[in-house]
């Protein structure tokens, strides 16, 4: 499926903050910000899919073929060094398994969004769920001015392709 760019006009057509989500090479979807609770954002799609993010990181999903839930996600996703978190995977089910993750030091980079070049920190997260031999790399692009995540590529479940998310905030 071809990708499409969110233009200033498309951005202005939405009343609320939203994310543009793409699973692997599939079509994109727009999810609207429905709620914010203690820093966790709940994004809802037209098909009732829900993605919950904390500082741009997916911490829970609902309505997908395979879902995840990080039981007590770390507030500061950018801590360097190893962090262990309890994780539930659904379809197939795996409960309270420990996932190890570590962040690399940020690298200066830039991305293009709404027709503008944005300076970002590119942050690489390595993860490993040893019990099932699943590991990988997630990427976060953090705006150097606002501190917000502008874009991410996340692997959240061994049965799902990489999820690419563009974040569009309205205040």
Please annotate each region the language model reported.
Residues 1-53, 60, 78-171:
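Acidic, serine/threonine-rich low-complexity disordered tracts
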Residues 63, 67-72, 115:
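Acidic/charged, solvent-exposed loop-and-adjacent secondary-structure segments enriched in E/D, K/R, S/T
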């Amino acid at each position: 499926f071809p990708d499409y760019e969110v233009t200033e006009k498309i951005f202005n057509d939405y009343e609320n903050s939203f994310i543009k989500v793409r699973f692997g090479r599939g079509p994109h979807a727009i999810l609207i910000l429905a709620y914010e609770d203690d820093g966790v954002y709940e994004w809802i799609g037209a098909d009732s899919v829900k993605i919950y993010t904390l500082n741009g990181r997916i911490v829970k999903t609902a309505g997908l073929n395979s879902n995840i839930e990080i039981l007590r996600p770390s507030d500061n996703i950018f801590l360097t060094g190893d962090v262990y978190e309890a994780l539930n995977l659904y379809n197939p089910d795996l409960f309270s398994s420990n996932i190890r993750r570590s962040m690399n030091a940020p690298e200066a980079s830039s991305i293009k969004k709404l027709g503008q070049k944005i300076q970002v920190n590119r942050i690489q997260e390595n993860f490993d769920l040893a019990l099932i031999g699943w590991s990988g790399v997630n990427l976060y692009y953090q705006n150097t001015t606002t501190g917000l995540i502008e874009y991410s590529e996340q692997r959240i479940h061994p049965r799902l392709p990489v999820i690419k998310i563009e974040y569009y905030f309205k205040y």
